[in-house]
Regions:
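Ferredoxin-reductase
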Residues: 144-285, 344-345, 371-375
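Histidine-anchored nucleotide/phosphate-binding helix
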Residues: 317-331
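Residue-level marker of beta-strand positions
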Residues: 60, 84, 126, 173, ...
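Reductase modules of NAD(P)H-dependent flavoproteins
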Residues: 2-78, 89-110, 334-454
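Fe-S ferredoxin-like electron-transfer domains
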Residues: 26-34, 102-159, 164, 184
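Cysteine-centered iron-sulfur cluster-binding motifs in ferredoxin-type domains/subunits
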Residues: 73-83, 116-120
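A short, basic/flexible loop-to-alpha-helix module at the beginning of a structural domain
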Residues: 280, 293-306
């Protein structure tokens, strides 16, 4: 009897459980019908009621527009951190989300400004976007070359399809699509250009020391990332990028010498995925196909006659090279004083130096200044330090580039606040330059920087 009763109780419990699950499933389906329409919804763009976009609901507005070949800029790949995919949503966008309020002022919210990657398409919408967005295209490009120009930086060159051109302003950027892909770092080629006098092993020792060959990147879903172009408009139907590989955060261990001195030693990486797009790019070989879209950007040359000072480091070289090559190779500018201050850890981190020295020879109004920050490498690099800006014997300076610029030029300048400053580099460099310019009293209208190129 006890066993029979237990079986009946178990059967009743199962029946109740199944019934509850069925009720919840029906409720979920009904809720989904209310929250996400089952048919297409329409998106009216810039008041064009005659040609609305008919789309499936459920995805972000950024993704939906991309599927319709309308490519809003997004340096973070839709992660909600860069806020570059702003647009006006006049109806159908729902309430502004907390993730958007971090990037929008009260005035912008009142003007219906939204962050497209954070807005889900659930109903008919009316939106406004800048007209220049319609000039953005997407191509399947072919990799021409992919050499290392520094230890962790590639010069990545792709060719557009025959007959296609990328009409852009110097300082613009493109977005690279990254497919579902796994990348094994041991298969990467980090050779410099064949003409490099250091030879094919130039960067291998540091990759060995930092155990980069053992890293693996897994990308489970399509993504995209933004990179500033290093080429200028007159360089044909190519896109040239300087991309730094993003390794996981390193781990360190501390040991003591027999003398009791504490030494920090590299101890591998945290279990974090390497940079998705940078790993993907580093793995590309000549002939491979890569999808890019563009042009985007707002880091452009200002049409004034003011003196220009450029400050760069790392992969921040890219948009600055684009500017300077356009200024001197295309515009042939002779009536503006221009200087470029670029810093690296050691000699092997400097690149394009010969190209800028050639511009110096041709244009007396341009000067190029370089500095190394790793003092431990100076002797091995055979570096001859400049005593000051008038020292013709020294090769370059020693120190962080913003401090080198301040000590050797800006401090003695009669009106540093009247100079236009253009800069791009690692986050710490950008922050240091911003503080320096603020201390000098430079107004915002004389400051332009690219915050993701480095």
């Amino acid at each position: 009897m006890i066993i029979l009763f237990s079986l009946k109780t178990l059967g009743l419990a199962v029946a109740v459980f199944v019934t509850v699950i069925m009720i919840l499933s029906v409720m979920l389906i009904e809720a989904r019908k209310k929250l996400v329409p089952q048919g297409n919804v329409s998106i009216i763009v810039n008041g064009d009621t005659e040609n609305p976009l008919l789309v499936q609901p459920g995805s972000s507005l950024l993704t939906v527009l991309s599927d319709q070949s309308i490519f809003l800029p997004s340096a973070c790949g839709g992660g909600g951190t860069c806020a570059m995919c702003e647009c006006h949503i006049d109806s159908g966008g729902g309430d502004v989300l907390p993730t958007e309020l971090n990037h929008l002022s009260r005035k912008e919210v009142a003007e219906n400004m939204r962050i497209a990657c954070q807005v889900k398409v659930r109903e008919n919408m009316e939106i406004r976007i800048p007209e220049e967005i319609f000039g953005i295209k997407k191509w399947e490009c072919t990799v021409r070359s992919n050499y290392n120009v520094a230890t962790f930086i590639k010069e990545f060159i792709v060719e557009l399809p025959n007959g296609e051109t990328l009409d852009f302003q110097s300082g613009g950027y493109v977005q690279i699509d990254v497919p579902v892909v796994d990348v094994d770092f041991k298969n990467m080629n980090i050779d410099p250009h064949p003409s490099d006098p250091f030879g094919t092993d130039k960067f291998r020792s540091e990759w060995d020391d930092y155990q980069l060959w053992g890293l693996k990147m897994k990308n489970p879903e399509p993504q995209f990332r933004a990179y500033s172009m290093a080429n200028h408009p007159a360089e044909g139907n190519i896109v040239m990028l300087n991309i730094r590989v993003a390794s996981p955060p390193p781990q360190w261990k501390f040991t003591k010498t027999p003398e009791g001195k504490s030494i920090r030693e590299f101890d591998g990486y945290l279990p974090v995925n390497p940079g998705v797009c940078s790993s993907y790019v580093f793995d590309q070989k000549p002939g491979d196909k890569v999808t890019i879209s563009g042009p985007y950007g707002e880091f452009f040359i200002k049409p004034t006659k003011k003196e220009m000072v450029y400050i760069g480091g790392g992969a921040g070289m890219a948009p600055l090279r684009s500017h300077l090559f356009h200024i001197f190779h295309t515009m042939k500018t002779t009536d503006r004083k221009v200087s470029y201050w670029y810093g690296g850890r050691s000699r092997r981190e400097l690149f394009y130096t010969d190209q800028f020295r050639e511009i110096e020879k041709e244009f007396p109004n341009f000067s190029y200044h370089i500095a190394l920050s790793d003092r431990a490498m100076l002797e091995a690099d055979g570096w001859t330090e400049k005593k000051d800006i008038n020292d013709k014997d020294g090769e370059g300076y020693v120190g962080f580039i913003h401090q080198v610029l301040l000590d050797n030029y800006l401090t003695a300048h009669p009106e540093p606040e009247e100079i236009e400053y253009y800069f791009c580099g690692p986050p710490m460099m950008n922050a240091a330059v911003i503080k320096m310019l603020d201390d000098l009293g430079v107004p915002e209208e004389n400051i332009a920087f690219d915050d993701f190129g480095g």
